[in-house]
Amino acid sequence: MSELEQLRQEAEQLRNQIRDARKACGDSTLTQITAGLDPVGRIQMRTRRTLRGHLAKIYAMHWGTDSRLLVSASQDGKLIIWDSYTTNKVHAIPLRSSWVMTCAYAPSGNFVACGGLDNICSIYSLKTREGNVRVSRELPGHTGYLSCCRFLDDNQIITSSGDTTCALWDIETGQQTVGFAGHSGDVMSLSLAPDGRTFVSGACDASIKLWDVRDSMCRQTFIGHESDINAVAFFPNGYAFTTGSDDATCRLFDLRADQELLMYSHDNIICGITSVAFSRSGRLLLAGYDDFNCNIWDAMKGDRAGVLAGHDNRVSCLGVTDDGMAVATGSWDSFLKIWN
């Protein structure tokens, strides 16, 4: 047996030991704890608005903190800021690269960001004196595509990339201030903790890592998925997060228990998950799928509580407003839909 093969086996044994040690610490299961909870019942949501204007596949969307405006990014080379109440376009921003994969709205509402196969995170200022939108900063540095970006504030943004790393940037100087390396596959998604001090990243190595924003340290690594992880989202209290994967499952992981608590899957669901989000209370988990649907899960019990059907192609992105009053789904059919 080669030395490398021996090391592989040892690593596998250690992994199993760690898994067993984690299991031994678990004094109870989520299923046992939530047995007394009333089921949420059947959740039915209606399409309240359809946002028409993109001319090609929509790849990403993100709500503003006002729960009214949202930004979407499409393969048509446009970033559109929408008013979800009126369905009007507030801004339509032509991009230098049409190969956009992610977009983000700053908490202040002053900036939006996007990026994709150009490997660059572009920041756009929405509140210029002239009233027009312009590029305020471009952040080059990743050696792979930009898969996700999220603002910490008007001067800091975190990006994830196909180069297997994440990065924290100082927007003012255009410099990377912290690099986060540790994944062995493309990083597909990131989610900021509610307090903004940590974030989780999901990658094509089928693992999720928890990072400290300030010091580039990987605090925890979570395994269990059997394929690429496309989406991650923090639970509203910041102590847990959910993931969506090409293995056709969503999973709930707890930071304090240091392990997986629950898996959301169904025999009829055999396609990958593109996007995940929690309701404001955390009781419902919404997940977008390759089969054109968005499933609603009872996050505590693991049962399917409803389905949002209305798109004619893959649901590529979704988001719940900060006030919890609406859900937006974006699809390869070029439309965004607002539900509640």
UniProtKB/Swiss-Prot annotation:
A GO BP term, please? regulation of potassium ion transmembrane transport
Q: Where in the cell is it found?
A: Cytoplasm, Perinuclear region; Cell membrane
Residue numbers carrying Phosphotyrosine: Y239
Under Pfam families, the record lists: WD40_Gbeta
Modified-residue entries (N-acetylserine), positions: S2
Q: Which Gene3D superfamilies match?
A: YVTN repeat-like/Quinoprotein amine dehydrogenase (2.130.10.10)
For this chain, one GO molecular function annotation is:
GTPase binding
Which UniProt key words apply to this protein?
Acetylation, Cell membrane, Cytoplasm, Disease variant, Intellectual disability, Membrane, Phosphoprotein, Repeat, Transducer, WD repeat
Which windows of the sequence hold WD repeats?
53-83, 95-125, 141-170, 182-212, 224-254, 268-298, 310-340
Record InterPro entries: G-protein_beta_WD-40_rep, Gprotein_B, Guanine_nucleotide-bd_bsu, WD40/YVTN_repeat-like_dom_sf, WD40_repeat_CS, WD40_repeat_dom_sf, WD40_rpt
What tissues has this protein been observed in?
Expressed in all cardiac subcompartments and in the brain, with highest levels in the atrioventricular node and brain.
Cellular component, GO, one term: synapse
Q: Does the keyword Membrane apply?
A: yes
Disease tied to this entry: Neurodevelopmental disorder with hypotonia and dysmorphic facies: An autosomal dominant disorder characterized by global developmental delay, hypotonia, and variably impaired intellectual development, often with speech delay and delayed walking. Most patients have dysmorphic facial features. Clinical features are highly variable and may include congenital cardiac defects, non-specific renal anomalies, joint contractures or joint hyperextensibility, dry skin, and cryptorchidism.
Annotated family: Belongs to the WD repeat G protein beta family.
Q: How does it assemble?
A: G proteins are composed of 3 units, alpha, beta and gamma. In this context, interacts with GNAI2 and GNG2. Interacts with ARHGEF18 and RASD2. Interacts with ATXN10. Interacts with SCN8A.
- Please give the function described in this protein's UniProt entry: Guanine nucleotide-binding proteins (G proteins) are involved as a modulator or transducer in various transmembrane signaling systems. The beta and gamma chains are required for the GTPase activity, for replacement of GDP by GTP, and for G protein-effector interaction.
Q: Give the protein name, as stated in the record.
A: Guanine nucleotide-binding protein G(I)/G(S)/G(T) subunit beta-2
What organism is recorded for this protein? Homo sapiens
